[in-house]
Amino acid sequence: MEVNFKQDKEIQEQIEKNIILTKLDDTLNYFRAHSFWPLTFGLACCAIEMMAAGGARYDIARFGYEVFRASPRQADLMIVAGTITEKMAPIVKKIYDQMPEPKWVIAMGSCATSGGPFVDSYNVVPGADTFLPVDVYIPGCPPRPEALIHGLLTLKEKIIHPKEVGRSE
């Protein structure tokens, strides 16, 4: 029996042109990336810039991220904005643990990413990544609303293309 490779190749080309093949995870990640449910966790001045991002000038709603949740059980994205103290760290971790999977974390501002100007203080945690798996870091003191929007779009790309960018654990 002779196998016709030319015919198999033609069939393969027709399938690629006319049938959309994807994995369920890829489809879910696409929709997850376009509909974050952020949990606001403003601990200092960065929270004011986070609120400004929701205002008319920056309009975070155009990306579909405007519905900030007050409950961790309804959120899939935690934006840690501000100084985290040793006393506050277990509470932040507990709130993170209450969020449903999949969940992501953005560390917004110098204090949340590395402790900021207070890093040498006796009670300041040197960054949220010491006890949380941070996905995106937004530098600045405080970072501008444009930086928050850029961080959200960066997280969106990480979710859509996880193998190309990777996820920190």
UniProtKB/Swiss-Prot annotation:
Keyword Metal-binding in annotation: yes
Cofactor note: Binds 1 [4Fe-4S] cluster.
Pfam families linked to this entry: Oxidored_q6
Keywords noted in UniProt: 4Fe-4S, Cell membrane, Iron, Iron-sulfur, Membrane, Metal-binding, NAD, Quinone, Translocase, Transport
SUPFAM superfamilies according to UniProt: HydA/Nqo6-like (SSF56770)
Names of required cofactors: [4Fe-4S] cluster
Listed GO CC annotations: plasma membrane; respiratory chain complex I
Role: NDH-1 shuttles electrons from NADH, via FMN and iron-sulfur (Fe-S) centers, to quinones in the respiratory chain. The immediate electron acceptor for the enzyme in this species is believed to be a menaquinone. Couples the redox reaction to proton translocation (for every two electrons transferred, four hydrogen ions are translocated across the cytoplasmic membrane), and thus conserves the redox energy in a proton gradient.
Membership in a protein family: Belongs to the complex I 20 kDa subunit family.
Quaternary structure (record): NDH-1 is composed of 14 different subunits. Subunits NuoB, C, D, E, F, and G constitute the peripheral sector of the complex.
Family annotation (InterPro entries): NADH_UbQ_OxRdtase-like_20kDa, NADH_UQ_OxRdtase_20Kd_su
Main enzyme class: translocase
GO biological-process terms attached to the record: aerobic respiration; electron transport coupled proton transport
E.C. no: 7.1.1.-
GO MF terms, alphabetically ordered: 4 iron, 4 sulfur cluster binding; iron ion binding; NADH dehydrogenase (ubiquinone) activity; NADH:ubiquinone reductase (non-electrogenic) activity; quinone binding
Record-linked Gene3D superfamilies: 3.40.50.12280
Principal subcellular localisation of the protein: membrane
Reaction catalysed by this enzyme: a quinone + NADH + 5 H(+)(in) = a quinol + NAD(+) + 4 H(+)(out)
Chain ranges passing through the membrane: none
Lineage, highest ranks first: Bacteria, Bacillati, Bacillota, Clostridia, Eubacteriales
Cell compartment(s), UniProt: Cell membrane
Name listed for the protein in its UniProt record: NADH-quinone oxidoreductase subunit B
UniProt binding sites for [4Fe-4S] cluster: 45-46, 111, 141
Membrane topology: Peripheral membrane protein
